[in-house]
Design a protein with these regions (language model features):
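Sec/Tat-exported extracytoplasmic proteins
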Residues: 51-52, 57-60, 87, 103-111, ...
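Active-site substrate-binding loop specific to GH73 endo-beta-N-acetylglucosaminidase modules
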Residues: 66-76, 207-256
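C-type cytochrome heme c attachment motif
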Residues: 46-58, 81-82, 97-105, 116-119, ...
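Short, low-complexity patches enriched in S/T/P/G
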Residues: 446-457
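Axial heme c-ligation environment in periplasmic c-type cytochrome domains
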Residues: 77-93, 104-129, 150-154, 230-241, ...
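Post-cleavage N-terminal segment of exported redox proteins
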Residues: 2-40, 62, 78-81, 102, ...
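Sequence/structural segment immediately N-terminal to covalent heme-attachment motifs in c-type
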Residues: 36-59, 64-72, 165-169, 179-209, ...
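Short, solvent-exposed loop/turn and secondary-structure capping segments
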Residues: 58-59, 64-69, 111-114, 145-152, ...
Length: 483
């Protein structure tokens, strides 16, 4: 009887344990596959759009967020990973905390460090509520793609040691969420939150130091990003965009085009197409309000023209009309540039560089691309062209003249330099000139950082110091033994 009772107790205990275990698994399963509200998922989608995730993490339009896009950096190319909710190749197994750590701290679920090409230094400003919304979107609003990018990140030593980012993060990363400034308006604070966090404007527009860290003392004052130059967007009327109004900046962020001042190309065109143009007007005006309040870090010079005030309509081609193309191409300098312009550019931009009346083909004078002291964007636009979608189904296109398979007329470095100098002399900042060597640097994706070399030298010096210390220690021990 005692044996039977004991057996019953054991069976009952086993059943209870099974029920508890099943309940625990059910709760865990529910945590992994929650049914988020449509409103929360939509909020997350909006924040992901504001963060421009799709621009870097999409190589093929039919597979959004599946990774594979190569990002050019001064230390090498970094390949964006699959961030779809795929459980085999994406982030489908990430918990919300792991997702938050990747987004705000640059730490993957496996503990490996991300490179700051992923702007976690800016995304650290996200609030917990917004991270929660983004997690909901990526888990339930993005279609999983069960394949890995064909290419992977392969940086030179020692940058390929991801653990090296731990020290960098301790020195330069921010780990505090955004704190509103009580002295500012709600609109300004909303704009600051979006511009500094999701929009990560500082990531591109702020120059970097020897360790590739953002120089806070020069925030938004302009920086080289690969082949392109992200210009000064402080409120300086001489160096930045202080001459713009909130309405004008909002228009530019919406369309990528501000007649008489600027036309988006390169990474900024991508940001406008995939991100800014998709935001609501209230947020765009808030961003504009904040950006136009960012102080300049350079002294104002009323006598100096800003980059939007150079050049005028000039028919600089009249002097060689009647000359054959073959003869014209034998010229050098700006004369060669004028021939190239007439043959390849004037049909769209006009013989006087005036563009079209509707500005679909923009004027070449009074624009940042020809007025900027740094000619990188002019060179990059010639080599790479412009190809972007605009709101309401529009399309901006300029053919490339580099070495792409779809280049209309592949131009040599000397020819690109000649064309650039003709454009600068005729329609832009004539104090700026371009060399064939500069063109080659832009053709290769921009100047490379000396950080890799510095790191290797530092490691070599460190190894020598350690070796010397070991030798000295060995000698000291040898003397002690002889005594």
């Amino acid at each position: 009887m005692q044996h039977t009772t004991s057996l019953r107790h054991r069976v009952s205990a086993a059943r209870t344990a099974a029920v508890l275990a099943f309940g625990t698994l059910a709760v865990a399963g529910a945590a992994m596959a929650q049914n988020y509200s449509p409103e929360l998922i939509e909020k997350g989608r909006y924040l992901a759009t504001a963060s421009d995730c799709i621009a870097c993490h999409t190589a093929t339009k039919t597979k959004p967020m599946a990774g594979g896009h190569s990002i050019s950096s001064p230390v090498g190319d970094i390949v964006a990973t699959n961030i779809t909710p795929s459980k085999s190749h994406g982030i489908g197994n990430y918990s919300e905390q792991q997702f938050a750590d990747a987004l705000r701290k640059g730490v993957r679920a496996d503990g490996a460090q991300l490179y700051p090409a992923m702007p976690y230094t800016a995304f650290s400003l996200f609030t917990n509520e917004d991270v929660h919304a983004m997690y909901a979107y990526f888990m339930e609003g993005v279609k999983p793609v069960d394949e890995a990018p064909k290419a992977t990140t392969s940086l030179p030593f020692p940058m390929n040691v991801r653990a090296s980012m731990i020290g960098w993060n301790l020195l330069f990363a921010n780990d505090k969420p955004f704190e509103p400034d009580p002295a500012q308006t709600p609109e300004w604070n909303r704009g600051a939150y979006l511009a500094l966090g999701a929009g990560h404007c500082v990531t591109c527009h702020t120059p970097r130091g020897a360790m590739m860290q953002e120089l806070a003392s020069k925030s938004m004052s302009g920086a080289q990003i690969g082949a392109w130059y992200a210009p000064d967007i402080t409120n300086s009327k001489t160096h930045g965009i202080g001459s713009w109004s909130v309405d004008e900046l909002t228009t530019y962020l919406t369309t990528g085009h501000l007649p008489g001042k600027s036309q988006a190309a390169g990474p900024m065109a991508e940001a406008i197409t995939h991100s800014f143009s998709q935001l609501n007007e209230t947020d765009l005006r808030a961003i504009s309000t904040y950006i136009l309040s960012v102080p300049s870090h350079k002294p104002e010079d009323p006598a100096q023209r800003n980059r939007f005030a150079h050049g005028q309509a000039t028919d600089a081609t009249a002097g060689f009309r009647g000359t054959s193309f073959a003869e014209g191409m034998k010229q050098s300098g700006t004369a060669l540039g004028a021939q190239i312009f007439t043959a390849n550019c004037a049909s769209c931009h006009g013989a006087s560089g005036q563009g079209t009346q509707d500005s679909y083909y923009p004027a070449l004078f009074g624009k940042s691309i020809t007025g900027e002291a740094n000619p990188s964007n002019l060179i990059a636009a010639i080599l790479n062209g412009v190809d972007r979608e605009t709101p309401k189904g529009g399309h901006v296109f300029m053919p490339p003249f580099g070495d792409q398979t779809n280049a209309m007329v592949p131009l040599k470095n000397e020819e690109v330099a000649a064309l650039s100098n003709f454009l600068l002399t005729s329609y832009g900042n004539s104090a700026v000139s371009v060399t064939a060597d500069q063109v080659q640097v832009i053709r290769e994706g921009g100047a490379k950082s000396s950080l890799v070399l510095l790191a290797r030298v530092g490691m070599a010096v460190g190894a020598v110091v350690v070796l010397l210390l070991l030798v000295l220690l060995a000698k000291k021990r040898g003397r002690a033994r002889r005594r």
